[in-house]
From Swiss-Prot:
Record bears the keyword Cell inner membrane: no
Organism: Aedes aegypti
InterPro entries from the UniProt entry: ALL3/gSG7_salivary-like_helix
Biased composition (Low complexity): 30-43
Gene Ontology annotations for the cellular component aspect, listed alphabetically: extracellular region
The protein's name: Salivary IL-4-inducing protein
Region (Disordered): 19-109
Subcellular location: Secreted
Purpose of the protein: Induces expression of IL4 in host skin by diverting host CD4 cells away from Th1 and towards Th2 responsiveness. Induces expression of IL10 in host skin. Down-regulates expression of IL12B, IFN-gamma (IFNG) and TNF-alpha (TNF) in host skin.
Biological process annotations from GO: immune system process
Principal place of residence: secreted
One family name in Pfam for this protein: Aegyptin_C
Length: 219
């Protein structure tokens, strides 16, 4: 009986020793997680550090780009300002130092005045036709020819101040003479309309006077 008790105690002690973990197992188990955690922390720290450094480089690059763009914009504005100032000064010098040269404008303004001389209100067709031909031949054509080389209308404007009024007066006098002629016995409209010497002479003198004025003032 005593022998059996001793045997059971020995078996229990052996079993206890077998089930107890060894110091090597404890050390290996406890150190591996620590190493992994340390490695993970180190890797995470390096990644965060690298990530934090990369934006800094991009920010610096963006800052340089913004500064360069700002310098370019400033230089461009300065160049534009100088260009505009130069154009403005050149334009001002031209306006002050050079006479205006626009033959088309001169032509248009003279034609506007010539167009005011009308014979539409003349009742008789023969008289109206003859007057229109006289004005075209002795007034419009010579005036258009003489203003061909005139570029600045302001210099010759005074030559046309009385043209419209004088022409209308000449037309009225001719119409009056025509009516007096047709009122005579044995006269007719055609014959009376053929006496053109008086009105033609008046219109020709007007045209000659204007041409001389333009020639002496256009340059």
């Amino acid at each position: 009986m005593k022998y059996l008790l001793t045997l059971l105690m020995a078996l229990s002690l052996v079993n206890l020793m077998l089930t107890r973990p060894t110091p090597e197992d404890d050390g290996g188990t406890s150190e591996e997680p620590q190493t992994q955690e340390t490695t993970g922390e180190t890797t995470g720290s390096d990644e965060k550090k690298g990530a934090s450094e990369e934006p800094n480089a991009d920010d610096a690059s963006k800052t340089d780009d913004v500064e360069e763009k700002g310098d370019d914009d400033t230089a461009k504005k300065e160049d534009d300002g100088e260009s505009k100032d130069g154009e403005g000064s050149e334009k001002s010098d031209k306006e002050k130092g050079e006479p205006k040269n626009d033959p088309r404008e001169t032509y248009n303004k003279v034609i506007e005045q010539l167009d005011q001389i009308k014979v539409d209100n003349v009742e008789d067709g023969h008289e109206r036709s003859e007057l229109a031909a006289d004005i075209q031949r002795y007034l419009r054509n010579p005036i258009v020819d003489v203003i061909g080389s005139a570029g600045d209308f302001s210099k010759i404007a005074k030559c046309f101040k009385s043209m419209v009024g004088d022409a209308k007066k000449a037309i009225e006098e001719d119409v009056k003479g025509f009516k007096e002629c047709t009122a005579k016995k044995d006269s007719n409209a055609y014959q009376c309309s053929q006496d053109r010497s008086t009105v033609q002479d008046k219109i020709a003198k007007m045209s000659s006077k204007i041409a001389s004025c333009v020639a002496s003032n256009r340059s």
